[in-house]
């Protein structure tokens, strides 16, 4: 699972989901990529599920890059606990994703197989995504 090794502060304020991605919206490493079309919190489990979906479909011969990291903690109080008495424990780690952000990149010799693998990975994510190619970028 993807979680930070150590953090300066264990609990943080909830990150904002408004606006568009300022950086990380170009393909740098691979030939194909998944791009987010709406804001979302993507958990470490969802990132891992998408990565496994890609690897199971392509098997060998390609390379996958994960461009997001779940570095923000989300806290939640246990069920049946009254209001007050401090902030709850960390429930999960999320990556704050804004529209336009490249989530995964990959390279693979066969285009149809690569696009199908990214489509399967996109179904594991909680936001609308699109698949883009490196040559389609402006």
Swiss-Prot record:
The keyword Ribonucleoprotein applies. Residues 1-16 have a biased composition (Basic residues). One of its GO terms (biological process) is translation. GO terms for molecular function: rRNA binding; structural constituent of ribosome; tRNA binding. Pfam families: Ribosomal_L16. The keyword Lyase does not apply. One of its GO terms (cellular component) is cytosolic large ribosomal subunit. InterPro entries: Ribosomal_uL16, Ribosomal_uL16_bact-type, Ribosomal_uL16_CS, Ribosomal_uL16_dom, Ribosomal_uL16_sf. Residues 1-23 are annotated as: Disordered. Keywords: Ribonucleoprotein, Ribosomal protein, RNA-binding, rRNA-binding, tRNA-binding. It comes from the Bacteria. Part of the 50S ribosomal subunit. Belongs to the universal ribosomal protein uL16 family. Binds 23S rRNA and is also seen to make contacts with the A and possibly P site tRNAs. PANTHER family: 50S/60S RIBOSOMAL PROTEIN L16 (PTHR12220), LARGE RIBOSOMAL SUBUNIT PROTEIN UL16M (PTHR12220:SF13). This is Large ribosomal subunit protein uL16.
